[in-house]
C-alpha cells in the first residue's frame, strides 16, 4: 500500500511539472507575437484609403505649384506686351529739359529741336529729373522710359581708368612750376583744412601756358599720378561738335561726371580751340564754339570753390584766349613754362639717358652748350633717335656720334615744319 501511494505522488509531481513547463512555453510564444487588432480587414482598408488620399493630395499640390508660375508669367508677359506696344519700337533718345506738369514735359532731341510731349504713366517719376536722358516713342516723341546711370560715351572715354606712369621725378627742372601746381591743385584735395584754418579759398583752377614741348602736359600727368582723384582729360577740339547744342551739353556732362566721381581733376588741353576771343560773326560754327565757351564759363562759376573739383587748362597761345576765361575767380593762377636753361637741360638729359648704355665718348655738356634752343620734347626726341641709330647698326651702346646725328635730324625736321608753316 505504501508503495502504490508513493508511485501516485511521483506521478502527480511529474504531471504538475509538465503543466508548468507547457504554461511557460505558451506564455513565451504569446509574448513574442504582435498584438492583434480587431477587426483586421477594416483597419487595412482604412490605411490604404488614407495612403491613397495622401498621394492624391501631394499630386494636386505639385500640379498647382507648376501652374502658378505659368499664370504669373502669362500675366507679366501680357503686361510687358502692352507696355511695349505703348512704347513703340525703335526708341529714340532725348534729354528732358523741364517739367510742365506731372504728365507733360519739354525735351530736346539730338538735332537740337525742342518738343512739348506727354510723359507716360508707367514711367518711374522718381528717376525723371531735368537733364536726364529719356527714351522717346518714335511716332509722337512721348517719354516712355529713362536711361538709368547713363554716361556720355565721349565723357566715359575721357575718364582715365589707370593713373599715368609719369611722376614728378620724370620732370627735369620746373621746380617753381611744380610747387605752384601742388599749392593750387594737389594740396586743396589732400589737405583742405589748411586753407580753412588760413581763412582763404583755394584756387578753382590753373592754366599752364608756354611754348610747345616745355612740359605742360607732362606736369598734368604727374599730378594725376600723385593724387588718387579721378582724372578727366579732354582736348579742346573734342568739345566742338557738329550739331547745335551738343558742345555745351558735353561740357555739362563733363562737370556732372566730375561731380559724381569727386574728388576729381579736369584737364582741358589746347583750350584755345574753344576759348578764343569773342567777336561778331555770321558763321554758325563759330557761334556754336562761342556758346560752348559760355557754358564752360557758367560751369566754372557754378561749382563751389571748396568742393573736390579742380580744373587744369593748357595752351600754347594764352594771348589768344578770351579775357573772361582767364580772369581771377575762374582761373586764379597762371603758370608759365619757358625754355629750359643749361642746368635744366642737363637734368632732362640725365632722366632720358638713365636707362641707356652710353659709350665713354658721350659728352652731354657739348649737346647742352649748343646754340640751338632745346625744349624738353626736343631732348627726349634726340635721345630716342640716338638709341634708334644704335639699334640700326646692331649696337647696344650709344656713342657721341649717334647723339650728334640725332640732334641734326631733329632740328632739320623742326626747321622744315617751321618753313612749311610760313608758306602754308
Curated annotation (Swiss-Prot):
One of its GO terms (molecular function) is ATP binding. ATP binds at residues 210-217. Keywords: ATP-binding, Cytoplasm, Nucleotide-binding, Nucleus, Proteasome. It comes from the Eukaryota. GO terms for cellular component: cytoplasm; nucleus; proteasome regulatory particle, base subcomplex. Residues 1-11 have a biased composition (Basic and acidic residues). SMART domains: AAA. Its main location: cytoplasm. SUPFAM superfamilies: P-loop containing nucleoside triphosphate hydrolases (SSF52540). PANTHER family: 26S PROTEASOME REGULATORY SUBUNIT. The 26S proteasome consists of a 20S proteasome core and two 19S regulatory subunits. The 20S proteasome core is composed of 28 subunits that are arranged in four stacked rings, resulting in a barrel-shaped structure. The two end rings are each formed by seven alpha subunits, and the two central rings are each formed by seven beta subunits. The catalytic chamber with the active sites is on the inside of the barrel. Acts as a regulatory subunit of the 26S proteasome which degrades poly-ubiquitinated proteins in the cytoplasm and in the nucleus. It is essential for the regulated turnover of proteins and for the removal of misfolded proteins. The proteasome is a multicatalytic proteinase complex that is characterized by its ability to cleave peptides with Arg, Phe, Tyr, Leu, and Glu adjacent to the leaving group at neutral or slightly basic pH. This is 26S proteasome regulatory subunit 4 homolog.
Amino acid at each position: 500500500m505504501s508503495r502504490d501511494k508513493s508511485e501516485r505522488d511521483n506521478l502527480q509531481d511529474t504531471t504538475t511539472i509538465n503543466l508548468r513547463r507547457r504554461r511557460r512555453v505558451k506564455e513565451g510564444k504569446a509574448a513574442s507575437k504582435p498584438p492583434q487588432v480587431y477587426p483586421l480587414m477594416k483597419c487595412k482598408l482604412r490605411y490604404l484609403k488614407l495612403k491613397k488620399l495622401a498621394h492624391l493630395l501631394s499630386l494636386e499640390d505639385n500640379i498647382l505649384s507648376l501652374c502658378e508660375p505659368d499664370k504669373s508669367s502669362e500675366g507679366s508677359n501680357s503686361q510687358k506686351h502692352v507696355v511695349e506696344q505703348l512704347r513703340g519700337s525703335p526708341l529714340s533718345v532725348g534729354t528732358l529739359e523741364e517739367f510742365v506738369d506731372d504728365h507733360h514735359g519739354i525735351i530736346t532731341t539730338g538735332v537740337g529741336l525742342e518738343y512739348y510731349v506727354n510723359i507716360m504713366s508707367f514711367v518711374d517719376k522718381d528717376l525723371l529729373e531735368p537733364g536726364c536722358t529719356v527714351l522717346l516713342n518714335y511716332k509722337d516723341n512721348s517719354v516712355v522710359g529713362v536711361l538709368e546711370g547713363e554716361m556720355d560715351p565721349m565723357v566715359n572715354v575721357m575718364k582715365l581708368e589707370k593713373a599715368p606712369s609719369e611722376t614728378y621725378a620724370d620732370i627735369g627742372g620746373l621746380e617753381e612750376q611744380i610747387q605752384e601746381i601742388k599749392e593750387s591743385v594737389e594740396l586743396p584735395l589732400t589737405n583742405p583744412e589748411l586753407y580753412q584754418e588760413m581763412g582763404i579759398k583755394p584756387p578753382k583752377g590753373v592754366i599752364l601756358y608756354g611754348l610747345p614741348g616745355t612740359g605742360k602736359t607732362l606736369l598734368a600727368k604727374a599730378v594725376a599720378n600723385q593724387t588718387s582723384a579721378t582724372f578727366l582729360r579732354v582736348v579742346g577740339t573734342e568739345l566742338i561738335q557738329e550739331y547745335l547744342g551738343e558742345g555745351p551739353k558735353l561740357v555739362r556732362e563733363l562737370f556732372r561726371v566730375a561731380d559724381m566721381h569727386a574728388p576729381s581733376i579736369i584737364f582741358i588741353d589746347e583750350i584755345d580751340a574753344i576759348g578764343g576771343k569773342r567777336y561778331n560773326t555770321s558763321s554758325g560754327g563759330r557761334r556754336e564754339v562761342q556758346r560752348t565757351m559760355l557754358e564752360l564759363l557758367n560751369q566754372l562759376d557754378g561749382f563751389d570753390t571748396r568742393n573736390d573739383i579742380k580744373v587744369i587748362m593748357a595752351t600754347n597761345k594764352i594771348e589768344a584766349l578770351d579775357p573772361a576765361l582767364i580772369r581771377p575767380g575762374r582761373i586764379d593762377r597762371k603758370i608759365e613754362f619757358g625754355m629750359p636753361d643749361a642746368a635744366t637741360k642737363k637734368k632732362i638729359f640725365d632722366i632720358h639717358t638713365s636707362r641707356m648704355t652710353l659709350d665713354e665718348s658721350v659728352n652731354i655738356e657739348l649737346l647742352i652748350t649748343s646754340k640751338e634752343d632745346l625744349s624738353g620734347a626736343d631732348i627726349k626726341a634726340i635721345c630716342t633717335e640716338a638709341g634708334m641709330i644704335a639699334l640700326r647698326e646692331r649696337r647696344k651702346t650709344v656713342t657721341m656720334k649717334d647723339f650728334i646725328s640725332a640732334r641734326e635730324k631733329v632740328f632739320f625736321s623742326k626747321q622744315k615744319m617751321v618753313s612749311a608753316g610760313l608758306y602754308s
